[in-house]
Amino acid sequence: SNADMKIAQEVSYLNMALEQVEQLNIQIATTQAKGGSSLASLDQRQAILDKIGSIVPINVVPRDNGAVAIYTEGGASLLDISAVTIGFEKQNTVTAHQTLEANTLSGLTLNGQDVLRSTALGGGSLGGYFEVRDVYGVQAQEQLDALSRDLIERFSDPALDTTRAAGDPGLFTDANASFDPINEVGLSSRLTLNSAVDTAAGGDVWKLRDGLGATTPGAVGDATLLNDLRGALEESRMPASGNFGTGALAAADLFSSFSGLLAVS
């Protein structure tokens, strides 16, 4: 995901910047010990410290001969004589099943030791990207999967289309198969139109009017099933999953609620 990539980029910059501050500390201390001017190095170091502080809030502690130590506001040491190495394993592709909680996405390490990111390295832009990946992204995925489930289940009632064989999927499918509630995670990425009416898959549009299991076209003017399909969308019902409140909602209301939740997040 984009957030995971951004985390990797920020960790890479932090490691480079901490090494630069370590070297500048040496230069400044050496110059001052010889009685020279280190103003240029001090300015360069301050610019780097400012950038580090925007990524992770820090406390800068003076040391002898103009050197500094760097600690996060959570108390983690990033540099005191020597810079630490911040570890993070980037994922090229993040799927709906991957979360930090499930240990399928990387957290952070300091010199190879796991740290509680929210405490040791919380705040700043780095913390923001973790929030997007591990909180808002997960919530949005759950809501989107719940929307997809609701859409499938609205058209799965056998009484809605009596031409379908028992157990066959309705108008919307889970990768062209019937939906199993235990497989809800990632459903939004598998949601597909039934191939019976998908012309790209060899289906026939007239089956929207005559039924997914119909073998021959029916009367052109018969809109009974089409009206029933519209009714399924407009029906107020309780979503089987997700966080959409406690009231019954039509499909349009669900999508509106989802959009509102994204805006708030």
Predicted features, each with a name:
Residues 1-265:
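Structural signature of extracellular appendage/secretion-system components
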